[in-house]
Design a protein with these regions (language model features):
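Helix-boundary and loop/linker segments of multi-pass membrane transporters
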Residues: 68-72, 206, 210-211, 325-328, ...
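N-terminal anchoring/assembly modules that precede and organize ATP-driven motor systems
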Residues: 55-56, 71, 78-79
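Hydrophobic alpha-helical transmembrane segments of multi-pass inner membrane proteins, especially
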Residues: 78-95, 101-299, 338-398, 423-427
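A juxtamembrane structural motif centered on a specific transmembrane helix
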Residues: 2-37, 41, 46-47, 51-65, ...
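Glycine/serine-rich anion-binding loops at beta->alpha junctions
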Residues: 174-184, 228-229, 311-315, 403-420
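TM-adjacent membrane-interface loops and short helices in multi-pass inner/ER membrane proteins
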Residues: 285-336, 346-348
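Cytosolic juxtamembrane amphipathic/interface segments immediately preceding
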Residues: 59-73, 106
Length: 439
């Protein structure tokens, strides 16, 4: 074979080969841009094609290979769960809102368009985070934590707005609102993982000062959430914090002590009447649903009626009678699962639960296969978050958990929740891609 032909076959050393033009550092990177020695086959590229049009073929070639490599190393089973839930959620939101909007003389597709935009923006955020080396999140975590903490402070100022009795929102120009507590879930997980893994790449267990630092890190957002107050987010954050500490390798006696302190704090909160009256009423309504069926217990009672009326296969999408009459309060957000139960029936509800199970199984798999302790803790924290939030949301719809106002991940309407959920999926994909590329 002539030297001229060899230069265009992509073999190492050829002056015209793409591989030969890479720097020694680039050549040494495993899977750089998806390009390997011998990766360009004879006949696949012609010298004339590389020079035509005044383009930079090497950059285009590397960009195409990098894009192909990025897609190949995604966890597509995880993406199936996310896309399936997002699609079903968008349809259910449309069904839950179109009748009320039509009766009011508005556009029946208003919430459909908004949620589609939320999903698209969320997917863009997910792709951006997925493309990062997740170890760089060690650098970004403190910045994100500071920003979300400031946001939690702002909601308590005059810039914050009250929704359903809680100062959880920031009013933005154009009629938009942001809920910092949703993003605080992500940054809390990253910061706690950073603290508990910073010195854990060896075999040493976390020291008492590591545990104290993690608890102090959680205390700030937890205190600000209590001040709003948002009981659902508070329960979720405490569970995620305790779960991540438990998985960090902490000694059992410290874990038992932490559990005792958590239980004592809950008891003191209840005994000193630190909860708002409406929060106490929600808890008592859960314990005795028949105590106030037309007041505090109304939402949960109507949700159970809607689910029961769906039967095995449901009344059909867009044909739910209770949904059309808007008998279930907050049916496009907190009680979206009731819409699924009435219109899609038991089968549709099981499909949603199955997609959530796929998401959780893949998240745990990513955690187990993570390259380091930081990746394990981050993925585990996200798995705990999604599992508990889905359980609480579905549970309050069927009457086995109190009504707390937590949305169903990827299904309930909301921009802040969707963006935070998608960012979390991006972090999971980044952890997975790191393992997949170098496995």
């Amino acid at each position: 074979m002539s030297a001229g032909w060899r230069s265009w076959t992509g073999r190492p050393g050829g002056p015209g080969s793409a591989y030969g033009r890479l720097s020694p550092v680039q050549q040494s990177r495993p899977g750089y841009g998806g390009l390997r020695p011998g990766g360009l086959r004879p006949g696949g590229l012609r010298p004339g094609a590389l020079r035509s049009g005044g383009m930079r073929p090497r950059s285009l070639w590397h960009r195409a290979l990098a894009r192909q490599s990025f897609l190949r190393h995604l966890d597509w089973a995880l993406m199936l769960g996310v896309l399936g839930l997002s699609l079903l959620g968008t349809l259910l939101i449309w069904s839950a809102t179109q009748h009320g909007l039509a009766r009011a003389g508005g556009d029946p597709q208003t919430y459909l368009k908004k949620q589609l935009l939320n999903v698209v923006i969320g997917l863009i955020l997910m792709a951006a985070v997925s493309s990062l080396d997740y170890r760089m999140l060690r650098i970004y975590a403190p910045v994100g934590y500071a920003i979300t903490s400031i946001g939690l402070l702002v909601v308590l100022s005059p810039l914050g707005s009250i929704v359903n009795g809680a100062h959880s929102w920031i009013a933005l120009p154009g009629g938009f609102q942001a809920e910092p507590s949703e993003f605080a879930k992500v940054t809390l997980i990253l910061m706690v993982a950073l603290i508990l893994s910073e010195l854990r790449d060896g075999d040493r267990r976390p020291r008492p000062r590591d545990l104290a630092a993690a608890l102090a890190c959680g205390a700030l957002p937890l205190g600000l959430v209590v001040a709003q107050p948002d009981l659902g987010v508070l329960i979720l954050m405490v569970a995620v914090l305790v779960g991540m500490i438990a998985l960090s390798g902490i000694r059992l006696r410290w874990l038992a002590g932490l559990g005792a302190v958590t239980a004592l704090a809950a008891l003191v909160t209840w005994s000193l009447h630190l909860l708002k009256p409406y929060q106490v009423q929600r808890l008592t309504a859960f314990l005795n649903p028949s105590a106030d069926p037309r007041g505090t217990g109304y939402s949960a009672a109507q949700a159970k009626i809607a689910i029961g009326s769906g039967g095995m296969f449901g009344q059909g999408l867009f044909h739910g009678s209770l949904v059309a009459g808007n008998f279930v309060p907050e049916q496009h957000t907190d009680f979206i699962f009731a819409v699924a139960g009435e219109e899609l029936g038991f089968v549709g509800a099981i499909v949603i639960i199955g997609l959530i199970a796929v998401l959780l199984i893949r998240s745990l798999r990513i955690a187990v296969r993570a390259d380091d302790q930081f990746g394990l803790l981050v993925a585990s924290g996200i798995a705990i978050w999604f599992a508990l939030q889905a359980f609480i949301n579905i549970g309050m719809t069927i009457g086995i958990t109190p009504v707390t106002g937590l949305p169903l991940p990827f299904v309930s309407y909301g921009g802040s929740a969707m963006f935070a959920d998608m960012i979390a999926i991006g972090v999971l994909q980044a952890v997975h891609r790191r393992h997949s590329v170098f496995d």
